[in-house]
């Protein structure tokens, strides 16, 4: 138990610093704060990484600077469909067209490239960290292309129709691009492989197909 004088000091501290602390943090520029996050790269790391990957894409895919983000978007979509597990065998490929030019990108090229470029950041799962860093961009893009995620891997996670893109295993459920219902779907999808018996809902809305019949 605190001595009377100690309690007095604590009250004094609280009363004299609360307003000052609120004023300081209410106007604090978040760009001045950074941290080491095992799930994502910080702004400085991201800028450095993008510079390296952009040059590799330009050299090996023969692309333009202005189209780089589009190529990056397709890599994120592919990662969502095959998962970012370290156990994935990169034996497939994906194809798309930009500006009338067709690109065939092999998994065995793009994901090892990402791992190589991520090596200096020493992350346990470099591909997952890479994709999670750009999850906001992925969400915006994937919403526009829902039919690209109709596959067995994502289907097994029991995600409601129209939300299949939320089955990507690199989503953190913290993106400002997600509403509460969508965050619940992401969280439920990540648990599905571990415990499919868990049921959940947000405002009566289905967040997992495994809940069908339980909420009626």
UniProtKB/Swiss-Prot annotation:
This is Minor capsid protein. Component that constitutes the tail found at one end of the virion. Together with Hsp70h and p64, encapsidates the 5'-terminal portion of the viral genome. Movement protein that is involved in local cell-cell movement via plamodesmata. At least five viral proteins, CP, CPm, p6, p64 and Hsp70h are essential for cell-cell movement. It is found in: Virion. GO terms for biological process: transport of virus in host, cell to cell. Its main location: virion. It holds the Pfam family Closter_coat. GO terms for cellular component: viral capsid. Keywords: Capsid protein, Transport, Viral movement protein, Virion. It comes from Beet yellows virus (isolate Ukraine) (BYV). InterPro entries: Closter_coat.
């Amino acid at each position: 138990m605190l001595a009377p004088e100690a309690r007095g000091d604590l009250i004094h501290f609280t009363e004299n610093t609360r307003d000052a602390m609120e004023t300081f943090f209410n106007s604090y520029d978040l760009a001045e704060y950074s941290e080491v996050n095992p799930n994502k790269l910080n702004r400085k790391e991201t800028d450095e990484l993008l510079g390296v990957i952009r040059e590799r894409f330009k050299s090996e895919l023969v692309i333009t600077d202005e189209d780089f983000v589009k190529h990056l978007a397709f890599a994120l979509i592919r990662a969502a469909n095959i998962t970012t597990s370290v156990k994935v065998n990169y034996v497939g490929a994906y194809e798309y067209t930009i500006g009338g030019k067709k690109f065939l990108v092999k998994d065995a090229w793009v994901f090892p490239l990402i791992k190589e470029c991520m090596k200096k950041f020493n992350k346990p799962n470099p591909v997952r960290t890479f994709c999670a860093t750009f999850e906001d961009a992925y969400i915006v893009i994937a919403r526009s292309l829902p039919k690209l995620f109709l596959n067995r891997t994502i289907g097994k996670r029991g995600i409601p129709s129209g939300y299949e893109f939320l089955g990507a295993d690199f989503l953190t459920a913290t993106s400002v691009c997600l509403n509460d219902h969508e965050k619940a779907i992401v969280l439920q999808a990540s648990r599905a492989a571990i415990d499919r018996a868990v049921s959940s809902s947000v405002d009566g809305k289905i967040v997992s197909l495994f809940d069908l019949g339980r909420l009626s």
